[in-house]
Structure formats: C-alpha cells, structure tokens
C-alpha cells in the first residue's frame, strides 16, 4: 500500500485528497468482503460499535499521519519505521499491563533500535526526505500498536461480529474522521489513489481475519515483514526517487528480526 500511495502522491501531492480517497476505497473493499461473509456469519451490527471507535485511531488518525509521512519521507523509509510497531506494542504491555520483561524481548528491542540507528546513519538520502515525516510515521506505528491490541482484545472476547464486518466498522469510523479532517470532495482525481485504497482495504480485512484467529504476538511480527516488502518494492518501482542503499536494507532486516524475536518470546 505504501508504495502505491507514494506513486499516487508523486502525481498529486494533495494529502487530504489522498488520505480520503485511500480510506474511502478501502471501505468499499471491506464492504464487499463483509457482504460475502454475511450469509455464513451474519452481520451483528449492534455489536460493532467498539470497532467503529477503534477505527478513529487506526485507520483514522493513523492514516492521516502515514500519508503525510509517505509524501515527506518516501515509501521505503516509512515502511521501515512502521516495522517498529511490535516494539511499541511490547512497550505498552510492559508499562501499562505489567507484563514481565525477558532477555529475548530486550534483544528484540535492541535489534529494532539498531535498525533505527542504521536509518539515521544513512549518507545518501533523497533530496525530498523530511525527517519530520519519519516522526509522523512513528506516531502512526504507535497508533497501529494500540489498534492491534484493542482488536485482539475484542476478538478474543465474546464478540459475534464477523472479522470483515469489524474491519468495515473500523474503516467507516476512520473514513468519517478523515472526511471531517479533509473537508473536501474527492472529485475526479481520486482515481489515481484507487490502487492504494484497494491494497489497503484488502490488507485491513486480512489483518482482522488474522487477529480473530491468532495472538498479537504472532500476527504483529508477521505484519512487520512489511518493512522488507516495502523497501523491496520501493527499490523495484521507485528506485530513482527512493535511493535504496545498503544501510536501509540492513536497517529493515534488523527491525524485522527484532519484531520476530519479540513476537516469538513474548
């Protein structure tokens, strides 16, 4: 999604339009998935409101931050920062949930920090890179981590809301927040953001399906692989503008390894 969104933003750098069009398209994809799931699992709309509220955090506020970050700092580096979400998730658990610390968790945290250091030590950076965009990306990753824990908490409870319906509710809440923030019509320019929106919608539904079936400690590290995928696709499709170097690749690998270590031993 990040690479497709970067390609669209290169053509039209309007962040408000891009965020609204991407979230709106993702909502349509989720609605189609929910419609396909309904005959077998039902709707249970009256119980979906907690997911609507979760959507205000992510994709709502998070998607605004991520779109700004991708415009200002590029897809590859933002994807790399998003890979730190497992570290944020564990930090939340240690500080607020009193989960015990362990050597593997500390080692995973060190690997993720080392990946961030590699990113900071880059010598050849694109001219358009804005470090503030990386801060936006980390804020988005923090909201992702909060979202992941909330969704898993809701899914592990007694909810009867199907995954696709839950994802639709979250995307609806997020899209409404984005629409209030953007305060503008989509117009005809939204078409260039459709590929990013389709990928976003498909990934969001898949994410909810995963959290309904597995723990955060298993799913979150798998999602962190996005760092490597994002860097790889950026090198393939955005080679001239992204300037993918050795340090960026090493940093992405360290972050994914750290996230995996945290997930396995948490």
Kindly give the residue locations of the regions a language model identified:
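Structural signature of hydrophobic alpha-helical transmembrane segments
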Residues: 42-59, 97-113, 156-174, 212-227
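Juxtamembrane helix-start motifs in multi-pass secondary transporters
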Residues: 17-19, 78, 163-167, 219, ...
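Membrane-interface interhelical linkers
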Residues: 2-53, 63-73, 121-136, 157, ...
């Amino acid at each position: 999604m990040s690479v497709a969104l970067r390609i669209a933003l290169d053509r039209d750098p309007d962040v408000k339009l891009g965020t609204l069009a991407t979230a709106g398209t993702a909502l349509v994809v989720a609605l189609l998935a929910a419609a396909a799931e309904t005959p077998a699992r039902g709707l249970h709309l009256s119980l979906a409101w907690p997911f609507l509220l979760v959507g205000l955090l992510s994709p709502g506020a998070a998607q605004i931050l991520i779109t700004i970050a991708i415009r200002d700092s590029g897809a590859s580096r933002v994807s790399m920062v998003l890979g730190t979400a497992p570290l944020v998730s564990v930090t939340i658990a240690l500080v607020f949930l009193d989960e015990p610390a362990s050597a593997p968790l500390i080692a995973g945290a060190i690997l993720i920090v080392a990946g961030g250091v590699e990113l900071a030590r880059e010598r050849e950076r694109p001219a358009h890179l804005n470090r503030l965009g990386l801060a936006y990306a980390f804020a988005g990753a923090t909201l992702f981590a909060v979202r992941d824990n909330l969704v898993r908490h809701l899914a592990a409870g007694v909810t009867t809301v199907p995954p696709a319906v839950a994802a639709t509710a979250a995307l609806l809440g997020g899209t409404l927040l984005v629409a209030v923030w953007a305060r503008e019509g989509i117009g005809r320019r939204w078409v260039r953001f459709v590929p990013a929106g389709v990928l976003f919608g498909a990934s969001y539904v898949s994410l909810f399906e995963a959290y309904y079936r597995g723990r955060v400690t298993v799913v979150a590290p798998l999602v962190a692989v996005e760092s490597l995928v994002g860097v790889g696709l950026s090198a393939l499709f955005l080679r001239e503008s992204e300037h993918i170097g050795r340090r960026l690749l090493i940093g992405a690998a360290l972050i994914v390894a750290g996230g995996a270590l945290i997930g396995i031993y948490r």
